[in-house]
């Protein structure tokens, strides 16, 4: 039996979906894939649905767990490391790819201890603590943004996006910025965003009716009711969904987006060519979402609106300016598309096989 590539990714869509894109590329070449994650993250649902074997570790994040959490941390990590070693012994992977999430740390150390080729991929424009540490153990260090971890030989390959995203026609071919009325997509990430759920409806209510766009909004399962009440109170019609499964179709539909600035979101905006008002998550570690947004905004593809400055009045002003100028939206869409790295998933898959035992 052909030895698999072990992919470690979990938690939110920002880790899981780029890793799934790489898994697709590997399996297209006949390379089996095994996944290492947890039972609590998004991977527990989407990885088995993709017909990929999922191995789970009992591990959780250390931040925000208080003194008891930190005291227990060595025991939790040692248990997870022992479990990860068992996974590697069972599957004997030819290479191990770490793409973030709680299982990636113990899994990467296990790969290093068993001398399996370790490749890590840092999606964000600011490297996280785990990847800064693991970069010392990795054979190859790959990055989604340029200039990250240069001291460890970081290679800028872009952030992998799913094949369906890369197949979306370019902005001109799909009539981006030319629909009447214009189409607004609001995406708060896979967990939603309370600030967007409450502010966007109020901002839209401030626009003249003739200028209001058609709206689709991913509000998150836990915050769906709050968003529905906000839209009802504002008197704004909306296609409101807890989670959008087919993001390729959603991005294809959109003329403009309002969203967070997670690495996956920015990569998909670029791959498809969608202009956006980016509202970085203020509590993100090392403020990495603001860093993720900078290249996109500097290229003329979007507007940066810090949450500290987010209000219905300010957002309405930004929307009014953009929606009144479809040619500008079309130019912004082309700028976004020019930043895309549609070959990122194939590149990461190729590097895994180059380093394979």
From Swiss-Prot:
CDD domains: GT28_MurG. Pfam families: Glyco_tran_28_C (PF04101), Glyco_transf_28 (PF03033). It is an enzyme of class 2 (transferase). UDP-N-acetyl-alpha-D-glucosamine binds at residues 12-14, 124, 162, 190, 244, 263-268, 289. GO terms for molecular function: UDP-N-acetyl-D-glucosamine:N-acetylmuramoyl-L-alanyl-D-glutamyl-meso-2,6-diaminopimelyl-D-alanyl-D-alanine-diphosphoundecaprenol 4-beta-N-acetylglucosaminlytransferase activity; undecaprenyldiphospho-muramoylpentapeptide beta-N-acetylglucosaminyltransferase activity. It catalyses: di-trans,octa-cis-undecaprenyl diphospho-N-acetyl-alpha-D-muramoyl-L-alanyl-D-glutamyl-meso-2,6-diaminopimeloyl-D-alanyl-D-alanine + UDP-N-acetyl-alpha-D-glucosamine = di-trans,octa-cis-undecaprenyl diphospho-[N-acetyl-alpha-D-glucosaminyl-(1->4)]-N-acetyl-alpha-D-muramoyl-L-alanyl-D-glutamyl-meso-2,6-diaminopimeloyl-D-alanyl-D-alanine + UDP + H(+). Pathway: Cell wall biogenesis; peptidoglycan biosynthesis. Its main location: membrane. GO terms for cellular component: plasma membrane. Keywords: Cell cycle, Cell division, Cell inner membrane, Cell membrane, Cell shape, Cell wall biogenesis/degradation, Glycosyltransferase, Membrane, Peptidoglycan synthesis, Transferase. It is found in: Cell inner membrane. It is a peripheral membrane protein. SUPFAM superfamilies: UDP-Glycosyltransferase/glycogen phosphorylase. GO terms for biological process: carbohydrate metabolic process; cell division; cell wall organization; lipid glycosylation; peptidoglycan biosynthetic process; regulation of cell shape. Its EC number is 2.4.1.227. Cell wall formation. Catalyzes the transfer of a GlcNAc subunit on undecaprenyl-pyrophosphoryl-MurNAc-pentapeptide (lipid intermediate I) to form undecaprenyl-pyrophosphoryl-MurNAc-(pentapeptide)GlcNAc (lipid intermediate II). Belongs to the glycosyltransferase 28 family. MurG subfamily. This is UDP-N-acetylglucosamine--N-acetylmuramyl-(pentapeptide) pyrophosphoryl-undecaprenol N-acetylglucosamine transferase. It comes from Alkalilimnicola ehrlichii (strain ATCC BAA-1101 / DSM 17681 / MLHE-1). The gene is murG.
């Amino acid at each position: 039996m052909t030895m698999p590539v072990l992919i470690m990714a979990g938690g939110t869509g920002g880790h899981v979906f780029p890793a799934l894109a790489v898994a697709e590329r590997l399996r297209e070449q006949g390379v089996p894939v095994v996944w290492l994650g947890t039972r609590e993250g998004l991977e527990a649902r989407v990885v088995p649905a993709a017909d990929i074997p999922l191995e789970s570790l009992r591990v959780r994040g250390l931040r925000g767990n208080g003194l008891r959490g930190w005291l227990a941390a060595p025991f939790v990590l040692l248990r997870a490391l022992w479990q990860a070693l068992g996974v590697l012994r069972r599957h004997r992977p030819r290479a191990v790819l770490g793409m973030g999430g709680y299982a990636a740390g113990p899994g990467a150390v296990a790969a290093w201890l068993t001398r399996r080729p370790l490749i890590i991929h840092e999606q964000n424009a600011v490297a996280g603590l785990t990847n800064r540490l693991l970069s010392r153990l990795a054979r190859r260090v790959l990055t989604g943004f340029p200039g990250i971890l240069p001291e460890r030989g970081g290679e800028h390959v872009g952030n992998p996006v799913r094949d369906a995203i890369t197949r979306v026609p370019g902005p001109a071919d799909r009539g981006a910025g030319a629909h009447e009325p214009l189409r607004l997509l609001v995406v708060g990430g896979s967990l939603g965003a309370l600030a967007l759920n409450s502010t966007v409806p109020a901002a839209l209510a401030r626009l003249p009716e003739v200028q209001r766009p058609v709206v689709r909004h991913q509000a998150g399962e836990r915050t769906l009711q709050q968003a529905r009440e906000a839209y009802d109170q504002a008197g704004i019609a909306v296609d409101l969904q807890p989670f959008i499964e087919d993001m390729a179709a959603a991005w294809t539909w959109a003329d403009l987006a309002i969203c967070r600035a997670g690495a996956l979101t920015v990569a998909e905006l670029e791959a498809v060519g969608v202009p956006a008002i980016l509202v970085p998550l203020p509590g993100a570690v090392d403020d990495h979402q603001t860093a993720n947004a900078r290249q996109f905004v500097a290229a003329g593809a979007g507007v940066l609106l810090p949450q500290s400055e987010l209000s219905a009045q300010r957002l309405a002003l930004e929307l009014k300016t953009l929606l009144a100028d479809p040619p500008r939206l079309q130019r912004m869409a082309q700028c976004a598309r020019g930043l895309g790295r549609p070959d990122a998933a194939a590149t990461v898959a190729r590097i895994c096989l180059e380093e394979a035992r």
